[in-house]
Design a protein with these regions (language model features):
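Short, charged recognition helix plus adjacent turn
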Residues: 2, 10, 15-16, 35, ...
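Short, Lys/Arg-enriched anionic-surface-contact patches
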Residues: 1-3, 30
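Short alpha-helical DNA-recognition segment
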Residues: 16-35
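Pre-recognition alpha-helix immediately N-terminal to the DNA-recognition helix
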Residues: 7-8, 50
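DNA major-groove recognition helix of helix-turn-helix/homeodomain DNA-binding modules
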Residues: 46-62
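Key DNA-contact positions within bacterial/archaeal DNA-binding proteins
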Residues: 31, 42, 60
Length: 74
């Protein structure tokens, strides 16, 4: 099962404009961000913590950004 990062991507665009600027704020490569958003590699706990900080995500909303599963359409 894969995660739905559409809300996270919207927040990245709102705060940073591009994935590259967001990646720079996290201290990782743009490719790493892309792979994470496309469920190719997992987020490390430290990266999630940093993303929450730089995106100013309210702690109660964290699950909606990082732990929402994609729903399969039948």
């Amino acid at each position: 099962m894969s995660n739905d990062y559409s809300k996270l991507l919207g927040k990245i665009t709102e705060k940073f404009g591009t994935q590259a600027k967001f990646a720079n704020a996290l201290g990782i490569s743009e490719r790493s961000v892309s792979l994470k958003l496309n469920n190719k590699i997992s987020w490390k706990d430290s990266e999630i913590a940093k993303a929450i900080e730089v995106l100013e995500i309210d702690p109660e909303n964290i699950p909606a950004y990082f732990f929402k599963y994609k729903v399969q359409q039948e």
